[in-house]
Amino acid sequence: MAHQSHAYHMVKPSPWPLTGALSALLTTSGLTMWFHFHSTTLLLTGLLTNALTMYQWWRDVVRESTYQGHHTLPVQKGLRYGMILFITSEVFFFAGFFWAFYHSSLAPTPQLGGHWPPTGIIPLNPLEVPLLNTSVLLASGVSITWAHHSLMENNRTQMIQALLITILLGIYFTLLQASEYIEAPFTISDGIYGSTFFMATGFHGLHVIIGSTFLTVCLARQLLFHFTSKHHFGFEAAAWYWHFVDVVWLFLYVSIYWWGS
């Protein structure tokens, strides 16, 4: 093995990006099969492949950072830049949905009845479940900040408690969103209103599930004493992501639920 005279981590070849891409293909194809042919085989295969890929990839990253010490300060700096760029790309991703919503709602066409919401659409009451969801996510933003401060102060017990509260609030939000979808008086097929509503809120809900998974991994790592006040970028990245999800929901609530109703 050649001597390494620099502080950067030269990552070894890994199969997980390939299996991750394969799982994405299987999952999206499986969703199509489920929607049109009511077959869940391909979807379940994709989700299982995705879960196994996440487990193996996280395992490798934990080994490299916690046990082998490859995540030096320059490497952590690069990871921070990477996470910032990723969140920036997510901002533009959601900007597309907001653009579609405002393009349709600010100048409704005659086909929509000339007003917004379109004729025949009964919007959800923004002061019922959506307001509760807003409170839940804002509370989770407070608890994740509490967890971060507890970690910086080496208060392990409070960090675990706050992280667990955040995860439970994330799960509660997801359940509330699912119940709202089931009871909604319109569907994704109901024109531009249904399309923009379910695409924007649905992708946000997916991000909440991803964030909850991210935080659950952080909780498991904290229980195994992986984080210190000086070395905890995995948790920091999860906290950034969660705050991003919070902010996106506030824009969704004000735009689609409140103003759009």
Curated annotation (Swiss-Prot):
Keyword line: Membrane, Mitochondrion, Mitochondrion inner membrane, Translocase, Transmembrane, Transmembrane helix
Membrane topology summary: Multi-pass membrane protein
Coiled-coil region list: none
Enzyme Commission no: 7.1.1.9
Membrane-crossing residue ranges in chain numbering: 16-34, 41-66, 73-105, 129-152, 156-183, 191-223, 233-256
GO CC terms of this entry: mitochondrial inner membrane; respiratory chain complex IV
One Gene Ontology term of the molecular function aspect: cytochrome-c oxidase activity
Top-level class of the enzyme under EC nomenclature: translocase
Places the protein is found: Mitochondrion inner membrane
Catalyzed reactions per annotation: 4 Fe(II)-[cytochrome c] + O2 + 8 H(+)(in) = 4 Fe(III)-[cytochrome c] + 2 H2O + 4 H(+)(out)
Pfam families: COX3
GO BP of this protein: mitochondrial electron transport, cytochrome c to oxygen; respiratory chain complex IV assembly
Superkingdom of the organism of origin: Eukaryota
Claim: Mitochondrion is one of the keywords in the record: yes
InterPro entries in the cross-refs: Cyt_c/ubiquinol_Oxase_su3, Cyt_c_oxase_su3_dom, Cyt_c_oxidase-like_su3, Cyt_c_oxidase_su3-like_sf, Cyt_c_oxidase_su3_a-hlx
Mitochondrial intermembrane side: 35-40, 106-128, 184-190, 257-261
Topology, Mitochondrial matrix side: 1-15, 67-72, 153-155, 224-232
Function noted in UniProt: Component of the cytochrome c oxidase, the last enzyme in the mitochondrial electron transport chain which drives oxidative phosphorylation. The respiratory chain contains 3 multisubunit complexes succinate dehydrogenase (complex II, CII), ubiquinol-cytochrome c oxidoreductase (cytochrome b-c1 complex, complex III, CIII) and cytochrome c oxidase (complex IV, CIV), that cooperate to transfer electrons derived from NADH and succinate to molecular oxygen, creating an electrochemical gradient over the inner membrane that drives transmembrane transport and the ATP synthase.
Family as reported in the entry's similarity comment: Belongs to the cytochrome c oxidase subunit 3 family.
Xref: PANTHER family: CYTOCHROME C OXIDASE SUBUNIT 3 (PTHR11403:SF7), CYTOCHROME C OXIDASE SUBUNIT III (PTHR11403)
Protein's name according to its UniProt entry: Cytochrome c oxidase subunit 3
Record gene name: MT-CO3
